[in-house]
From Swiss-Prot:
Class of enzymatic activity (EC top level): hydrolase
Organism: Vibrio parahaemolyticus serotype O3:K6 (strain RIMD 2210633)
Cofactor binding mode and count: Binds 2 manganese ions per subunit.
Protein's UniProt name: Formimidoylglutamase
Residue sites binding Mn(2+) 2 per the record: D160, H162, D257, D259
CDD domains membership: Formimidoylglutamase
SUPFAM superfamilies per record: Arginase/deacetylase
UniProt EC number: 3.5.3.8
InterPro entries reported in the protein's UniProt record: HutG, Ureohydrolase, Ureohydrolase_dom_sf, Ureohydrolase_Mn_BS
Record PANTHER family: ARGINASE/AGMATINASE, FORMIMIDOYLGLUTAMASE
NCBIfam families the UniProt entry points to: hutG (TIGR01227)
One Pfam family matching this protein: Arginase
Record-listed Mn(2+) 1 binding positions: H129, D160, D164, D257
């Protein structure tokens, strides 16, 4: 593992300062603290933010690279947002994937997540959606270390135009783990460890997923809602389904691929959506998930690609999503809920 795999240069948080407002004028950049995971035990209750600078998985998936530059640009958009909570935020730095060393950097990212979770809920800023395998691996490592006797029921909720259930190993083709494979990798992990696989994909596009992927989703009993079905007429029904999904799980892992939003809202992604799902449409589902903050241990935001952004609007969208999640996590009970 090279020295470059973790940023030695810390992100410099800065932004507007309204001295006349005192503490009531605080913004994210005022409260965030650089912290090592080894120091979190001494820290007060808060929320950790970790960057994962990677687009190696996107390249392997034949996508448009650029997401590697995303974490610090999301931080920059996040810095000036107002912060109304007493809970601090901790910046754990950024894991960097160089030279297609995806598996090694995913392992490093997972280790940091597993070290942070005993003390704080964590938000990971990607990076391509290969970050999802690192995120779940860190969550799994946390449970195996701290609750080895239990098999946690983890609900994975993915807002995404794609299932990301592609094969990551095959005798018929030369395939590798990529941004298109993480939830298939997670399924294989759950199968090997006799854990239940609870996966929901909301906003999936029929035009962007082949019959093979829909068949795979059906085989794995994935609960999915297509982009064309996510509308105000169907809100009540799908929110009820989401409630059942949440009720069936002890813990939640939320992952948001920014390509679920329309290209007009999120142009800065590898695979922009011609249709997509509006933020207003997704908001009630996100609010329902965040209501269960004591189940929500981990979240990540994936696929921001600054190479194709317009006036940083996708960065601001990612930052607002991070802000929404952090606000909910900041009110989380500090003591971990027991596994049922």
């Amino acid at each position: 593992m090279s020295q470059s795999d973790l940023h030695q240069q810390k992100f410099h948080w800065q932004g507007r300062h309204d001295a006349e407002d005192g503490k009531l004028g605080q913004r994210i950049h005022h409260v965030v603290k650089h912290q090592k995971t080894s120091e979190l035990e001494k820290a007060s209750q808060g929320v950790s933010i970790l960057g994962f600078a990677t687009d190696a998985g996107v390249a392997r998936n034949k996508g448009r690279i650029g997401a590697k530059k995303a974490p610090d640009l999301i931080r920059r958009a996040l810095a000036n947002l107002a912060w109304h909570k007493d809970a601090p935020l901790y910046d754990l730095g950024t894991v960097v994937c160089d030279d297609d060393l995806l598996e090694e950097s995913q392992s490093r990212c997972a280790n940091l997540i597993s070290e942070a979770l005993p003390h704080t809920p964590t938000i990971v800023l990607g990076g391509g959606h290969e970050i999802a395998w690192a995120s779940f691996s860190g969550l799994a490592e946390y449970f195996k270390t701290h609750h080895p006797e239990k098999k946690p029921k983890i609900g994975i909720i993915n807002f995404d135009a794609h299932f990301d259930l592609r094969a990551f190993e095959s005798s018929l083709a030369d395939v590798k783990p990529s941004s298109g494979t993480p939830f298939n990798q997670i399924h294989h992990f759950c199968q090997r460890n006799d854990w239940a696989f609870h996966y929901a994909c909301l906003g999936v596009s029929r035009s962007s997923n082949t019959q093979a992927l829909f068949q795979k989703a059906d085989e794995l009993n994935v609960w999915y809602v297509e982009d064309s079905q996510l509308n105000y007429l169907n809100h009540s029904y799908h929110l009820t389904q989401l409630q059942h999904f949440i009720d069936d799980c002890d813990y939640l892992y939320l992952t948001i691929d920014l390509d679920v939003f329309p290209a007009a809202t999120a142009p800065g992604v590898s695979a922009p959506a011609a249709r997509g799902v509006s933020y207003d449409t997704i908001a009630p589902f996100l609010e329902r998930i965040l209501h269960y903050k004591n189940k929500l241990m981990l979240a990540d935001i994936a696929e921001y690609n600054p190479n194709y952004d317009v006036d940083s609007q996708t960065a601001r969208l990612a930052a607002r999503l991070c802000w929404d999640i952090a606000n909910a996590m900041a009110d989380k009970e500090h003591k971990r809920q027991p596994i049922k």
